[in-house]
Amino acid sequence: MLVAGNALNCLFIDSSGFQRYLGFGVTNLNGATVKSYKQEGFVIDERGKLKRFNRKKLSRKRCGSLRGRGWKYGSGFVDGIFPVLSPIAQKILSFIQKETDPDKVADVLGALPSTHASWDDLINVSVQLRLNKKWDSIILVCEWILRKSSFQPDVICFNLLIDAYGQKFQYKEAESLYVQLLESRYVPTEDTYALLIKAYCMAGLIERAEVVLVEMQNHHVSPKTIGVTVYNAYIEGLMKRKGNTEEAIDVFQRMKRDRCKPTTETYNLMINLYGKASKSYMSWKLYCEMRSHQCKPNICTYTALVNAFAREGLCEKAEEIFEQLQEDGLEPDVYVYNALMESYSRAGYPYGAAEIFSLMQHMGCEPDRASYNIMVDAYGRAGLHSDAEAVFEEMKRLGIAPTMKSHMLLLSAYSKARDVTKCEAIVKEMSENGVEPDTFVLNSMLNLYGRLGQFTKMEKILAEMENGPCTADISTYNILINIYGKAGFLERIEELFVELKEKNFRPDVVTWTSRIGAYSRKKLYVKCLEVFEEMIDSGCAPDGGTAKVLLSACSSEEQVEQVTSVLRTMHKGVTVSSLVPKLMAKSLTVN
């Protein structure tokens, strides 16, 4: 009988069933030993077939048990072997997913016998938690193994912990574990370096990621022999943070220069990268490249490619990829269908998206929450707010709880219709359903009130944001500056501009362009140039919108020529800020 107070009762309820299914030797509270079981287990091979394996025979291989071969970053279990969770492992998993108290976890795990089978169960549970993205739970289990258990931790345990801390942006803890690994005289694996690099990239510390590559060379790993796992982790880590697109491309090019052959996963990452940057033509180019290199695309490749075209509303191209996927013998899953629906939604064809939705159901693929959200968005974009609400209600009827995004998409649909009453009702319903409106929702209401000229309500929301849990962000001020600019309240614009700087917000190109646009509407050409000079001096690069509002401020052909001349210099490497004072001087002379 395996009982250790209430904590264990919640984990091991049926002791007879426990012995019948698990049967390994366990010492109970009275010191008696439970009879051990036959060393036999089950695995699912790479073809999805259930097979038996002899745990005893496996445990006598190098390193013992599944140590050193049980888990590998990026591929689950090595050699296509995915051990099925044993009954005791399933109970451990269920308990760990609910428990957050380290002491209770230690009490329960401490009752496990110090056997290879227990070790395998713990590692299998940790890997399953990783698949479920339960980073806190992984930390609870692996920290217990490392600090408090009688088990001898191995590199797998360290790697799982480094991964979990990296995912939580706790790079210092990941770094500390790497140092501890070295001090414990373990040899870092390629996975160790890959996960540490990814942790640094996710934290925005690219320089430290480069240091890890140097560290690899110090351990006699030359640049030519750095594996694909490390490069993939580097690229993936850079992709986790906005603004690192060029750095990720550089790593991909370096990888090819070092003659490290990209894998399907590498190409999938890069196709996704270009897709998110709205460069579907580059995604397509990479797809063609991988085919020419005999690198076989998988379902994730096609999903990424359909998504790339979907973001630009290229539904015909997305459908071609969908057909190619099926010609290659792959079965579309819910993610592919969702991506194809998104392409029709972005292209402004809600009924096309609805046809894909029906096709998905007809083919036996169950729509998920994202599928319904896409349909709400598709109808909302087309101004069919009643249809959007019908999908929203159908989702609730089926027991799919609407998320913040679901409410936001419905809110956006009615906002486009300028239906204030309905929008206010949606926000109220969110609170009643336990989904508290966030800054994004309040910004949407702010924009709606502003567009309708209801400035009192707009200022009321701003006051709530200053005193409530949802604080204002740079988008809040961009909306306010744009609304007041269109209304001609120039003094209020300057007050808001000072206020956002006091709150340590950095004005972006939208902020500056909205501010210039306010003066442009009044044809205050010189003031527009002054603000433009401030913008350049602050290090903010103008875009097409900035050029448009500057040109609209011009009231003569000469002013148009002056502005055009300055804008052209942006593409010739000339310092624009040095030309603005001259332009202003000419303008004042003319006036």
From Swiss-Prot:
Keywords, ordered alphabetically: Repeat
Record has Lipoprotein as a keyword: no
PPR repeats: 154-188, 189-223, 227-262, 263-297, 298-332, 333-367, 368-402, 403-437, 438-472, 473-507, 508-542, 543-573
Tagged with keyword RNA-binding: no
Name of one Pfam family that matches: PPR_2
PANTHER family associated with the record: PENTATRICOPEPTIDE REPEAT-CONTAINING PROTEIN (PTHR47942:SF63), TETRATRICOPEPTIDE REPEAT (TPR)-LIKE SUPERFAMILY PROTEIN-RELATED (PTHR47942)
Family to which the UniProt record says this protein belongs: Belongs to the PPR family. P subfamily.
The name this protein goes by in its record: Pentatricopeptide repeat-containing protein At2g35130
Organism: Arabidopsis thaliana (Mouse-ear cress)
